[in-house]
Amino acid sequence: MTAERSGSPAATREAGLARLADFVPRAGRAYAAERNTDRGPQDHSNVSTLSPWVRHRLVTEREVVEAVLQRHSLDAAGKFVQEVYWRTYWKGWLELRPSVWARYAASVAPALAALSAPERATYDDAIAGRTGIEGFDDWARELVDTGYLHNHARMWFASIWIFTLRLPWQLGADFFLRHLLDGDPASNTLSWRWVAGLQTVGKTYLATTQNIEFATEGRFRPRGLAAAAPAVEDDAPLAAPGPAPRAEPLPGGRVAMLLHEDDLHAESLEPLLSAAGVEVIAVASASAGESRASQAAPTSPLVAGFTTQALADGRARAGAHYGAPASALDGLTASAIRDWASAHDVTAIVTPYAPVGPVRDRLDRLDHDLASDGLRLSRLLRPWDARSWPHATRGFFPFREKIPALLREEQIGRDPR
């Protein structure tokens, strides 16, 4: 699942559902046969381009898979269903190993500061699309201009960045996260680690002229690419997976609902709330701000604009659905939340579960401050995540074997046995 055909898409649930309906007829064997071809920014009709909406859960993974399996069998649409579950797997993998995210986030600024003058010049050329490497420069400009790259192009770009330009993978991952409309902390960080040989230890991805020429239908034939891809060394041993998160008990009675950019389909959380006897009497949205920014550079204006519009759409829908006043808070801060809760005379706040990443980091820091003011912040863990994430203890292929059973638990599609 990748982003928009060209330009900036509408960050609304309505637009995401329209894109889903348009793609569903092509989600079967046609997708499997054509998905690896990158025809360029003017024609991405062979992929779904749904990921910006799924990243913010304007449209949920469950809805996407359910719509596809209402039209196609799992056998026919298996490759696309796997792509949806890849995103779930990456989130689960990082959820069980949050220290990997913490180390990455802390490494970006030092990696930039450690660049020599020639390396800094190479870095500046790479992000500006002026290295002289055919294809690579085009992808850099496409990313900045549209917030999109075909998944295959992302792999080639990362490989050239690491092995041909010999730049730190962390700076490449940061460049992507700041510019991709679908920039997801787990998928992005772990995909770059995979190319570098850190995710599947010792296994790297080498971009070749022949593969790029073939999969771009002759648009690009870059010269001078690295002939080898030695794995990047990591001085931190990979920790064993920790426990998966569990649904926490919710407070009964009157609550306020706080939305953030990681999950903006509050309507589908109603069954969890109803089961706990919860009444939503106020809704607010708050952004983690420059949550994807780093000391390397700020977040792309395209990304910032898409996120702002997505929050507004999610807030309006939630307010209408729960019949509650909806507000936009001035940031995901303790003071803003405290004032909002006080205005509605509530001490219990519910919020969609934020997976490991910048929003989660911000919420975790808020817990103590809010508790000291007598405010309880409870996370709503979706069944999709609760069922899937515990299986992300190893590589994707063992996880993939669980997909039929997970679909049965979700009661999606035809019997996938």
What do the PLM-derived regions correspond to, one by one?
Residues 2-82, 86, 91-92, 96-115, ...:
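Trp/Phe/Arg-rich N-terminal binding region typifying the photolyase-homology
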Residues 76-92, 136-195, 200-204:
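Structured ligand/cofactor/substrate-binding pocket environments in proteins
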Residues 51-52, 56, 121-124, 147, ...:
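Flexible, active-site-adjacent loop/turn segments at secondary-structure boundaries
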Residues 120-144:
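Helix-hairpin-helix/helix-loop-helix acidic hairpins
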Residues 60, 64, 132-135, 152:
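Amphipathic, well-ordered alpha-helical segments in soluble domains
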Residues 97-125, 195-196, 205-214:
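Long, low-complexity intrinsically disordered regions
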Residues 180-235:
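C-terminal, helix-dominated tail/subdomain
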